[in-house]
């Protein structure tokens, strides 16, 4: 995306940021003296054998008990560009698939990209490295770690043809609204209500011509609002069809129409104004939660949802964004949604900067006194996790208070930000050191 568009269209930015780069860091303040939480955190901590997938998963069994009967588990990341966050997600997903009956890896990528990845892991043609680069080149996820995840998913499906794992994208369609979405809607209408087809194709025609996200966003706001109206009308017409309750083909076609409408709607927000950014980002988190819940209901299967900590959590650290995807999912699913957040003490990540879209390794020093990670890193285990809902009282009290915490999106430097860990997530994974992810182009 062009630099000017990147500054004036925060949705393309925030689509890969969490909330990083949008909030000014706050000065650290001396905390009042309280009971030392370290012994209580030590008692609650379960050590991790490794952050790499493969090998024994015995150390993850306590996490499995913490997850319980949840149908959707949100698994965050404290940066978008660290190797260990990618590999831990891969490792946890494999465990949840093999031991807890999960089948879907959902990600804050477009519905279009999700369809293409899902086709690949279920035996579709193509080279996985080229596919990932084509779909994710503008995002933090064009990485060798992501390729390895999709490679494992495909290999798993080769071994388990009767219970396959799936990939789902729950976000707006960027960098493009895939032609398969329009085709899916029009093909269904052609087969079931051909008299409606001319109206549907007429409504979609101008949106098809602007399916590329950057081209779309370069159009005047008035035109984008008109196109959003077209997409909403097409969705409303689809909703009026009367298929049988068991018509899975209709459910997918309807979601294609919903996804086109969601994308056209968010492209019609005035992202050159603070209020437009606020309203657009609230809409985005709501739609991601809705799409995830729809998929879980449609498939009847359990879902691991991968996103930044800010998007899988319950609290936002920025008052301009008062409600995030995790909070919307909790509203929809109650205790059937569980949020897992990450912290880390030091290390490196791949990130862009405010001046350049080039991805480079960036270093992050150890946490300083008064930060959440300063205390968390004193636990005797380098890498561990704990259930913040059931930790000893002293630990819960400490975890409930806001302190400066590392939370980094695509733009570096970023933060730290004042975050309350326990109100934000159910389970916390702390890693001593992280390293930069491996982009395919490097």
Model-derived features: positions:
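Secretory targeting and sorting signals
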Residues: 1-30
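Structured catalytic-domain cores with a bias toward divalent-metal coordination
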Residues: 5, 9, 31-442
């Amino acid at each position: 995306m062009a630099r000017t568009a990147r500054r004036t269209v925060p949705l393309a930015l925030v689509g890969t940021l969490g909330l990083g780069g949008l909030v000014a860091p706050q000065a650290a303040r001396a905390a009042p003296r309280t009971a030392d939480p370290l012994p209580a955190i030590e008692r609650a901590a379960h050590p991790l054998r490794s952050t790499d997938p493969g090998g024994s998963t015995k150390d993850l069994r306590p996490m499995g008990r913490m997850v319980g009967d949840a149908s959707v588990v949100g698994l965050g990341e404290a940066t978008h560009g660290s190797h260990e966050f990618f590999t831990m997600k891969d490792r946890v997903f494999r465990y949840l698939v093999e031991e807890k009956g999960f089948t879907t890896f959902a990600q804050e990528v477009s519905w279009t990209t999700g369809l293409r990845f899902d086709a690949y892991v279920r035996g579709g043609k193509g080279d996985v490295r080229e596919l990932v680069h084509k779909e994710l080149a503008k995002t933090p996820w064009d990485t060798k770690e992501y390729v390895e995840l999709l490679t494992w998913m495909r290999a798993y499906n080769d071994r388990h043809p009767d219970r396959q794992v799936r990939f789902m994208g729950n976000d707006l369609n960027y960098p493009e609204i895939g032609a398969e979405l329009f085709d899916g809607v029009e093909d269904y209408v052609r087969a079931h209500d051909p008299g409606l087809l001319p109206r549907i194709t007429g409504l979609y025609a101008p949106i098809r011509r602007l399916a590329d996200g950057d081209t779309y966003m370069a159009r005047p706001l008035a035109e984008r609002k008109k196109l959003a109206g077209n997409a909403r009308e097409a969705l409303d017409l689809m909703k009026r069809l009367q298929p049988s309750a068991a018509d899975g083909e209709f459910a997918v076609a309807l979601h294609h129409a919903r996804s086109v409408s969601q994308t056209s709607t968010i492209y019609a927000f005035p992202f050159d104004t603070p209020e437009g950014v606020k309203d657009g980002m609230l809409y985005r988190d709501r739609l991601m939660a809705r799409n995830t819940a729809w998929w879980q209901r449609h498939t009847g299967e359990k879902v691991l949802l991968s996103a930044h900590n800010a998007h899988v959590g319950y609290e936002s650290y920025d008052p301009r964004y008062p409600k995030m995807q995790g909070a919307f999912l909790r509203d929809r699913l109650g205790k059937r949604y569980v949020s897992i957040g990450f912290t880390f003490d030091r290390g490196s990540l791949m990130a862009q900067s405010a001046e350049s879209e080039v991805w480079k390794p960036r270093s992050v020093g150890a946490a300083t006194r008064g930060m959440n990670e300063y205390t968390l890193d004193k636990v005797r285990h380098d890498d561990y996790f704990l259930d913040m809902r059931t930790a000893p009282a002293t630990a819960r009290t400490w975890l409930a208070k806001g302190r400066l915490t590392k939370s980094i999106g695509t733009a570096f430097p970023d933060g730290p930000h004042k975050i309350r860990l326990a109100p934000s997530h159910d389970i916390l994974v702390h890693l001593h050191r992280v390293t930069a992810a491996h982009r395919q182009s490097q």
